């Protein structure tokens, strides 16, 4: 098994501030789909992003996985959800709902 370099593990460095959503999609729309995938226990960012992307596709929302991941990072940075690890590395970081 070859060891991955950090660059090879990075899935996306897109920042939410750099995202331009299509007119048919709002940040609130994405938040609903992302929160539907979250739980109190830690989940890999890759899982949350992948399932939110499936939900977007099922609703014909033209949103990429990079955009969803950027929104997840923005939610963590805003303190809306919790995250651990380098969130640009989807398989090596996790998110969850804030424990109350």
Regions picked out by a protein language model, each given a short descriptive name:
Residues 21-44, 55, 67, 73:
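Positively charged, polyanion-binding regions of nucleic-acid-associated proteins
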Residues 74-87:
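A short, conserved structural fragment
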Residues 86-100:
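Short, cationic-aromatic polyanion-contact patches
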């Amino acid at each position: 098994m070859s060891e991955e370099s950090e660059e090879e593990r990075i899935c996306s460095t897109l920042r939410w501030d750099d995202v331009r959503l299509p007119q048919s999609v709002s940040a609130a729309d994405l938040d609903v789909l992302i929160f539907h995938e979250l739980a109190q226990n830690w989940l890999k960012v890759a899982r949350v992003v992948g399932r939110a992307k499936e939900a977007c596709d099922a609703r014909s929302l033209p949103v990429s996985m990079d955009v969803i991941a950027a929104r997840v990072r923005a939610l963590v940075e805003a303190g809306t959800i919790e995250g651990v690890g380098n969130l640009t590395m989807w398989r090596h970081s996790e998110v969850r709902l804030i424990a109350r």
